[in-house]
Amino acid sequence: MGRIGSPLGKNEFSWVIKDFSSLGVRAIYSDEFVIGGCKWRLIAYPMGNRIKKYMSLYVEVADSKHLPSGWSINTELRMEVVNHNLYKPSQQKYRKNLWFDQKTPSWGYKTMIRHSKLSGEEGFLVSGEVTIVVKIDVYRVFGKIKRNDDGVKSNDSVNKTQQVKETMDINGFQVLPSQVTLVSRILKKYPDIALGFNAKNRHLRTACMNVLISLIETLCQSPQELSDEDMDEADNALVYVQDAGFKVDWLDKKLKEVKEKKVVEQTGKTRIQELEEELKEFKQKCLDREALLEKEKAKVLAARASLTLDDFV
């Protein structure tokens, strides 16, 4: 049972899982790899992580247990199960402004891909192999982390925090240039939002603001695109920012609104499928009735035909 991993570029890693169909319910791990100066590894559950009919896939900070207290990594993540059929799309999951830290050293999807797609002629399973490609853009690393001789970072209280991309100060919050407009709008519309937020540590302040931004970006997605996992994470994010001291009653209302829309979307989708099935059956009945009608017309025409002399002599 081989599992081969190899770097594709500065921020990409490829993992080939061999003999996929023979793997059991236990988690399997890729080799460790380095992106953005941080060590990572992939974790796959071929039979699903407490969920049936799916393969689950996660990315994890490999040496998280050995990192110093308070570390965090801001990333953009794309995970892909490669489809080798050129005419069919690969299965992709994407998340921006994603934070890894002590509480969340790993992140991924329980429902990465259905088992039904990993069989037959879908193109994802070829010669018993499944290929995973992960792309990680590392924007900021907070924590006292030092490079080893091999270029890999390790914890060391001497070194300073790495800033991969410059940030801007908005009312005491360090944010990326791409986040300035959104954060400014939030603080302008809700000036009391941070009155109860007492954290002085700038890294903690920034981490909390990024959780808030991620939550808003999640709720801006179409309900159709939001999975049950996304909604659970939204609940957790809301509790996190509330516990931190943010006044976000307005965001709580928006979350409930999105949940209601999600229920309507799911219920409506199910009802549409039911109606389509009923309509299909109705159309078939109409076709059957039309065929029966033509037969009856033919019988009537035959019955109306007059007898000729040939019928007698």
Curated annotation (Swiss-Prot):
Extract the coiled-coil ranges from the record: 246-297
**The keyword Coiled coil is annotated on this UniProt entry:** yes
Q: Which organism is it from?
A: Arabidopsis thaliana (Mouse-ear cress)
Instruction: Tell me which CDD domains the record gives.
Output: MATH
Q: Keyword annotations for this protein? A: Coiled coil
UniProt-listed InterPro entries: MATH-CC_domain_protein, MATH/TRAF_dom, TRAF-like
Instruction: Cite the MATH domain residue spans from the record.
Output: 10-136
Can you name this protein? MATH domain and coiled-coil domain-containing protein At3g58220
Q: In which domain of life is the source organism classified? A: Eukaryota
Q: Which Gene3D superfamilies match?
A: Apoptosis, Tumor Necrosis Factor Receptor Associated Protein 2, Chain A
Spell out the Pfam families in the cross-references.
MATH_2
What stretches pass through the bilayer? none
Q: Which PANTHER family match?
A: TRAF-LIKE SUPERFAMILY PROTEIN
